[in-house]
Amino acid sequence: MGTTIDFRSPVPVYEQLAGILRKQIRDGELPPDEQLPSQKDLVTTYKVARGTAARAVKMLQEEGLARRVPGKGIYVWRRA
């Protein structure tokens, strides 16, 4: 998976975005305890809808790769 979104792909956009973030986590570009980019930043960077960005981040949380810290944001989980 590349670092860009292919809007013509049969793979849903939120899954592509989650894959990009997952790769950044696994490759150490987003190390443990680092805050994930905000939804606004994801929308701007990848030209996706806000709901798409939220769904991608939720996937990472469900996979145990990210966690929400109330009042602070979403961070890469150290156990990733």
Language-model segments: what does each one mean?
Residues 1-50, 55-67, 72, 78-80:
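Extreme N-terminal segment that seeds HTH/winged-HTH DNA-binding domains in transcriptional regulators
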